[in-house]
Amino acid sequence: PMRERLFPRWCTALFALLPMSELLYLPADGQSVYAAALACTVCALAGIGAARLSDRVRHSAPAQWVLALTSLFPLLASIARMSIFLQKTVFTGRSCGSTVVLLTVCILLMASMGLNRCAMWALPIAWLAGTVLLLSGVLTLTQLTPASFSAPTAALLPQFRHILYSLLPASVVLAFSLPETRLSASVSRGLSAGGALLALLLLRTVLLLGANTAALLPYPAFTAAGLAAIGNFARHGEVFFAVPLLLCEIGRCAALVCVLLYPFTRTCGVLHLRRPQ
């Protein structure tokens, strides 16, 4: 049925969530933009290759178990960093354990729809996040200081490795798990679009806060978003900025849970997808 088909635009949106999920946590300095752009390019190329092999992987039980085990690492890393972020910024009075439980419940509820419908919901989430991020950038455009811009140097390599370590496993695991090899172009488009937005917002952070100040902050992009406001309506611009990005990461985690459970359920979801009679 149509609802169980993974359309290319849904796939594009799902993979666009992956780079955008990184924005809240990345350090920002003069080399961040180049490191992010390079890492997302590598992930897009790796994702194309993985998607083209997805048909073989789907019919191999050992490969499915390897994917399931591999998906655990980016999944647990995402839940941990979301919990720490929320505890330090929003839920300062709550324990980290309660935040982990709350996030896990949200992720499992979304994963219960199955991978295809997770990708379907990724489309409005990606549009919401993209719109909010671009609006945040536009509102701070007049406050940017181009003097903070710097040319690429070898100092970008540590950040490149850091972003690649965080982004590549989820990108490759999800690309290998796609139901059709023809979706490889959607993988590339999604990672490229999300990567471009990630690089632009990191650039905005550096030009707005200055490279030295941004490098000292634990969540520089979140702090920079707090300077975007529309009168009294959005005085806490960082909240409007963070919510869609957290939704991006919950969507990413839900898709990884679908991959994790596939060897047990033989469907890409917690609940068995209905089949035509």
Predicted segments with their positions:
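Membrane-interface helix termini and inter-helical loops of multi-pass transporters
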Residues: 24-31, 82-91, 143-155
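Hydrophobic transmembrane alpha-helices that form the core helical bundles
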Residues: 54-93, 112, 245-268
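Membrane-interface helix-boundary motifs at transmembrane edges
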Residues: 55-62, 115-121, 179-190, 265-273
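Membrane-interface interhelical connector segments
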Residues: 208-238
